[in-house]
């Protein structure tokens, strides 16, 4: 039985992680975010009520769960306060159940200004970031000039550090990007107004999680974005700025990697991507329109329309390698209802005739690839809300089985709708 479970995306994000984390946290004591920031968008539907979380772990909707934002997350005080408000208005005691690492880098207004100025400057070569300051905040962290949650304990020292780093960034904004500088006084006043709320939630995350492990408490690590957006292993440079893969758990939370027991990879029954970058199986036809409309494929964070395409087993095999996936959760199976035939990409062929069984990493390597497809019959039956395998048509069962064969990993969970109850659990990650 696994006590410590990782839930992460195996495609380009938006796979439906939030719902699955919420479902499985019925059995967990802790839910931990370990990377990313408020560029994530985790949508939960409980008894018909929709909640979108960007920064706070999805376990916050479970009364028995402690939620932790680990050191690998870049934290925007403004975004956190904005997210806490509606939850607290619903009677959820966020400040009693949410805890922060003092090592979380802060996202401040100058990071957002830089992010947006850079995207404008890139023009047609824009990465397609959310414009929320994620990348610049991670840059500051690596450059060792970033301000962290722990710096807020000494407000005078924080003010001096802020002045220094803002002089650096405002110089870039004014003289390189021809953009307006950010007001030091306004940033300082805003952060100081939030400082006491943030510092009151600080704990020693590594110690807390290790104590929980020793007690036998069940811990869930909630990934954001997806494997193919990983800063190192994704379609570089069209990637996010953090390690979205399983290897990011230990670095982003301080939890020992040897203690991770089960890694659940979330994958849609088809593929989507937001923003620029390679997307080999993308569909610009009626099928792509069907997937986008029926799947309501609009970003939870940006509202941007998602690009849609067939399931890519080649990319999925890469995700299996990187993450050592224990089992898959296949989401949005119901979106495939009504398609006469369904295709799965099983290989990429290069210009020199070589067949690739796993996807390349750099974006340039995707140019001029020929895709190898396998066609399967679709189904007309309605799978929405199915709760047992017996309720699925044979063609859907065959599709699930073929994905298992192509990836070498079992599909342990199938999601057939947005509500936590619209789920088929073949094997529970916690072994229950």
Swiss-Prot record:
GO biological process terms, semicolon-separated: 'de novo' AMP biosynthetic process; IMP metabolic process
Entry GO terms, CC: cytoplasm
SMART domains recorded: Adenylsucc_synt (SM00788)
Record-listed IMP binding positions: 14-17, 39-42, 130, 144, 225, 240, 304
Principal location listed in the UniProt entry: cytoplasm
SUPFAM superfamilies: P-loop containing nucleoside triphosphate hydrolases
Needed cofactors: Mg(2+)
EC number: 6.3.4.4
Keyword Ligase assigned: yes
Superkingdom in the source lineage: Bacteria
Pathway the protein acts in: Purine metabolism; AMP biosynthesis via de novo pathway; AMP from IMP: step 1/2
Subcellular location field: Cytoplasm
Listed PANTHER family: ADENYLOSUCCINATE SYNTHETASE
Functional note: Plays an important role in the de novo pathway of purine nucleotide biosynthesis. Catalyzes the first committed step in the biosynthesis of AMP from IMP.
Family in the record: Belongs to the adenylosuccinate synthetase family.
Subunit: Homodimer.
Protein name (Swiss-Prot/TrEMBL): Adenylosuccinate synthetase
Record organism: Photobacterium profundum (strain SS9)
Organism lineage string: Bacteria, Pseudomonadati, Pseudomonadota, Gammaproteobacteria, Vibrionales
